[in-house]
Every structure is written in C-alpha cells, then in structure tokens.
C-alpha cells in the first residue's frame, strides 16, 4: 500500500506549483496635477474623500501639488488606481474644475 500513497501523494508538487504561480500584482502611483483654476479647498476635499487622507495630510499634499506641480496620493493595484483616477476626474468635471489625476506604473 505504500506504493499507492507514493504514486498519488502530490501535496508537495502542488504547493511548489502554486507558489511559483502566485506573484505580487503590479503597483501604480496615483498623482494629482496642479492647475491655475481648481481651488485649494476642492483639492483637499478630493484627497480626504477619495484617498482617505486626514485634513492635515490632505493640506500637506495640496501644498506639494501647488508648489511642485504634482504630488503622490497613493500606491494601488492597477484596478484600484484606475478607479480612483476615474472617480476624481468625474468628480472634478461635475464640479466644473479642471483638476487632473493620473496614474503611472510604480
């Protein structure tokens, strides 16, 4: 009977196969870009509501955007980054602001 067990004991093989197939998903950075028209308080609102930043964190990021032209809002998987970009762009459009949000591969 030990031959039977040896023939069908694939536990170690399956574990190795699964470990080889699982890899970390690619990460993407999401940035907000500066413009001359979007109010600073709107940018803070976006950072608090879409990126779960505190008021203080959002203000710091907003000032970085204002003075450096862009700032990192977060790092996400591709699907989440795409969703955040779409949500921010749509929200800005609905509120008649030209705020731009982009994603780049990390």
Curated annotation (Swiss-Prot):
InterPro entries: ClpS, ClpS_core, Ribosomal_bL12_C/ClpS-like
One GO BP annotation of this record: protein catabolic process
Residue ranges that the Swiss-Prot or TrEMBL entry lists as coiled coil: none
A UniProt-annotated Pfam family: ClpS
Chain ranges passing through the membrane: none
HAMAP family, per the entry: ClpS
Known function: Involved in the modulation of the specificity of the ClpAP-mediated ATP-dependent protein degradation.
NCBIfam families, A to Z: PRK00033.1-5
Quaternary organization: Binds to the N-terminal domain of the chaperone ClpA.
PANTHER family membership: ATP-DEPENDENT CLP PROTEASE ADAPTER PROTEIN CLPS (PTHR33473:SF19), ATP-DEPENDENT CLP PROTEASE ADAPTER PROTEIN CLPS1, CHLOROPLASTIC (PTHR33473)
Protein family (similarity comment): Belongs to the ClpS family.
Protein name (record): ATP-dependent Clp protease adapter protein ClpS
Organism: Colwellia psychrerythraea (strain 34H / ATCC BAA-681)
Encoding gene (name): clpS
């Amino acid at each position: 009977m030990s031959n039977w067990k040896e023939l069908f004991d694939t536990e170690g093989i399956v574990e190795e196969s699964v470990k080889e197939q699982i890899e970390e998903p690619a990460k993407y950075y999401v940035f907000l870009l500066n413009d001359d028209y979007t109010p600073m308080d709107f940018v803070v609102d976006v950072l608090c509501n879409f990126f779960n930043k505190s008021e203080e964190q959002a203000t710091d990021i907003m000032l970085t955007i204002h003075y450096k032209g862009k700032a990192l809002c977060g790092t996400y998987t591709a699907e989440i980054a795409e969703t955040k970009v779409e949500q921010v762009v749509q929200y800005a459009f609905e509120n008649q602001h030209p705020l731009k949000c982009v994603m780049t591969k990390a």
